[in-house]
Amino acid sequence: MKNLLKMSDLSPAELIHILDVAGQLKAQQKLGGTAPLLAGKSVALLFSKASTRTRTSFEVGVYQMGGLGNYMNTSELQAGRGEPLKDTARVLGRYYDCVVWRTYRQRDLEEFAELAGVPVINGLTDYAHPCQVLADLMTIREHRGTLAGQKLCFVGDGSSMANSLIAGGLLAGMQVTCVCPESYRPAADVLMFARKYGSQFHLTADPAEGVRDADVVATAVWNTAAPGTPESEQRLRDFVGYQLTGKLLEAAKPDAMVLHCLPAHRGEEISTAVFEQHAPEIFDEAENRLHVQKAVLAILLAGK
């Protein structure tokens, strides 16, 4: 693994190795601290979007492993005044051992990775959110003991979370169902990737069908438009019936897990009651962002 740009870049063995290392680092941290695996290393934390979990978990993770993490908002750099992306990549690659970038376009991230000359980690793009999905898979494995054969259902729009959960779940040997309205499907290349797995993947617009007998049901914000705008109102209409409610989850297994990448819009993609019922899993999931990201850094920079 040279970078972490999207889930489908990983092999099944690489994915499981990340989770194994994450588990080891989590156990070490609970016992008093992680070895200084990043001593003498510097990590650029480059953000073009607002962030709570991604920024803070990377900052804390780099610190816990003895490295230096520098947060930068791209609006405050020369890149925010028109300096070409390729120049920023080649400069930061000379200063830092690794770059984490949270941005909009996946193709910008991939161009950056080609030019930087150091490992690049996707902190979220409009296409992919691999760090979050690694945390999801770690959480499922902690609660269930295994990933292979588990039925994972994602309910929402064809967002970075859908794209990444589909790829990650299939690579981990899970049965994956994606539930979304017809006009909000995942990316075409993700669906092509998923179809290689045959009956292991299912796409439907019917929430009740999708969650039937699921071991894990995941969702994410699907109303990302500003409140009161025409787009927001349209999404509220289009996603009627797609909220995770107690009634909908009756079709899942009685002990089904519920995951949410946060932040949550209670009353839209998930009811308040369901969110609070499954808060222990959801906040385990949030904590595990720290541990999987430490694992990715340790693998890329310390040869773990």
Locate predicted features:
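Positively charged, low-complexity intrinsically disordered leader regions
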Residues: 1-56, 60
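Anion-binding alpha/beta catalytic cores of soluble intermediary-metabolism enzymes, centered on
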Residues: 90, 97-168, 260
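Rossmann-like adenosine-cofactor binding region
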Residues: 195-273
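Glycine-rich phosphate/diphosphate-binding loop of Rossmann-like nucleotide-binding domains
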Residues: 48-60, 142-220
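Short, structured coil segments at secondary-structure junctions
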Residues: 65, 95, 115-117, 172, ...
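Active-site cofactor/substrate anionic-group-binding motifs, chiefly glycine-
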Residues: 42-43, 47-95
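Adenosine-phosphate binding glycine-rich loop
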Residues: 255-256, 261-304
